């Protein structure tokens, strides 16, 4: 188990970055997913979209270089590439709902073995709402969940989500600091494992049946 929160997030973001392909239009959700833009190889051309109205979003700026008028969907400072563009949210969501986004990377509170996603509310707590997640999970061609494997020691990958769902059966891939899990028809398939953990540990921290790939390999970070 990796207890260093910042290290865990870095591992996840680096691995998700390796999942993206040259030329794709990619949406990054709020929080951890926005870190992915910092780890794209320089020879790759990935176009990042933010649902508040940016196409061509770049990496996070240095603190002394941040433009207070340029923020991503989570309200964090971001950069925009020279060929980037700004537009209103109606155009942004037309891109999403029209199926033009190749990949969306989202955080989650829970994911289950059916690919169901819960990422917008904990009953009894005040939250801002679902945001664009419900559009993204249905409009994007591939949905990657980027999240810590547990929350305060409790599994976030479950047999069945207990929180209100954002979408049913829409997650394609789950990336945590411990490994990479594909959502397949038979359930959850562990395809990559962090070199600092074991299959037994991952299973003990996962509240769902976990299939092990015959081609299980070290996590590529």
UniProtKB/Swiss-Prot annotation:
Description of what induces expression: Transcriptionally induced or derepressed before the onset of solventogenesis.
Control of this protein's activity: The acetate and butyrate conversion reactions are inhibited in vitro by physiological levels of acetone and butanol.
Catalytic activity: acetoacetate + butanoyl-CoA = acetoacetyl-CoA + butanoate; acetoacetate + acetyl-CoA = acetoacetyl-CoA + acetate
Active site (record annotation): 51
Disulphides: none
The UniProt record lists the keyword Nucleotide-binding: no
One Pfam family from the record: CoA_trans
GO molecular function list: butyrate-acetoacetate CoA-transferase activity
Assigned EC number: 2.8.3.9
pH dependence: Shows at least 80% of maximal activity from pH 5.9 to greater than 7.8 for acetate conversion.
Keywords for this protein: Plasmid, Transferase
EC top class named in words: transferase
Statement: the UniProt record of this protein carries the keyword Transferase: yes
Top-rank taxon, per record: Bacteria
Quaternary structure annotation from Swiss-Prot or TrEMBL: Heterotetramer composed of two alpha subunits (CtfA) and two beta subunits (CtfB).
Protein task: Catalyzes the transfer of CoA from acetoacetyl-CoA to acetate, butyrate and propionate. Also shows low activity with valerate, isobutyrate and crotonate. Plays an important role in the metabolic shift between the acid-producing and solvent-forming states of C.acetobutylicum. Acts mainly to detoxify the medium by removing the acetate and butyrate excreted earlier in the fermentation.
Family to which this protein belongs: Belongs to the 3-oxoacid CoA-transferase subunit B family.
Name of the protein in question: Acetoacetyl-CoA:acetate/butyrate CoA-transferase beta subunit
Organism of this sequence: Clostridium acetobutylicum (strain ATCC 824 / DSM 792 / JCM 1419 / IAM 19013 / LMG 5710 / NBRC 13948 / NRRL B-527 / VKM B-1787 / 2291 / W)
Gene: ctfB
